[in-house]
Amino acid sequence: MIKTTVVGSYPVPSWLPTCSSQEGLRDAMLAVIKTQEMAGIDVVADGELYRWDINHAETNGMIDFFVRPLEGVEQLLDPERLKVWQEQPGNSFRKKPPGIVVGELAVGALDLQADYELYRGLTAWPKKFTVTSPYMLA
């Protein structure tokens, strides 16, 4: 028998930006999973919501999720650099700066195990955990 599954990211629920917390993220993931179960999908996915970041809603935080852990990237800026960043046109919608390259880029580490643990207990159905493809990172 051929099993059904889904591909790609689910849209972020409209209420998540106003309820952005670990509990809100868990509830959003649960809504995505239960929707798939009710539709009869055999192998469910979390909709890639584990990458959500309220500070970077225009990309759901997906780009920063992969960039922040790299060596040579900082997100915490000294007050002077933070002020310069905040004054740039187009940054007013962000609460925090994105990852900013401050040196030579080098290998970083993702904690995908912790992200999977957030999702694992939400369903007894067969599940898959999505990681991005290399072209997204290029």
Q: For each predicted feature, which ranges?
A:
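Domain-level signal for soluble alpha/beta catalytic cores
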Residues: 1-138
